[in-house]
């Protein structure tokens, strides 16, 4: 190219590259170009009697540059420069939801929780989900049985740790057991997603969903009036520097409620009302069960 002087005289060219599947969240994608130029179009420039100048870069020739650019470049021929541009891969996002907020939070009542993790297209390493079932000294209890099991949904995910899309491919789920309290951990590991050219379509939206149930723990520390809250933490590798990125979300606090009943029993002489009974009389008992004024839940 020949570029004349003047602000209006520029050359522009465009090229495209494809982001590789190995790209990780928050990884900075750098692209650097090196360029050189000459002081004249070539040797055939009539600046002397012969019509040709000396070899490019020589003392009697044109000044030029070299690519790749030497480091350091101490040569007089230093007509060279670089230009860089960069962009970053998107981070993960997550949300924690109580799918049944209207459920009365009494001892043993199951609440349905869901953690949704949205991943950028590419590869995510060391993906871990922790759910804190306990709060302020009281804890939900995880249910994992035929009636209330843990389930997973994998949307636009290709593999987990190179294997199938199921819990067996996770690095570890040792704490995700029936009756667990405190913190349960899904160590998912490495996930590879499906991918597409988002310039032309946006049908691929990688997502992992964990759905599970927990209930207020029936122990001596969980009682009427206690506040309970459930929170989740997601960690994963920063693709640029390898540090750990952390995401947090929690559900609304719920107050534990319990039924408190009072029972009264009365007896009367059905054979001779108002008279003390004797042998052969029929006694009638009336039992009355009602909520105490302090009761906060159906029984």
Regions found by a protein language model. Give the residues of each.
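Exported/extracytosolic protein signature
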Residues: 1-299
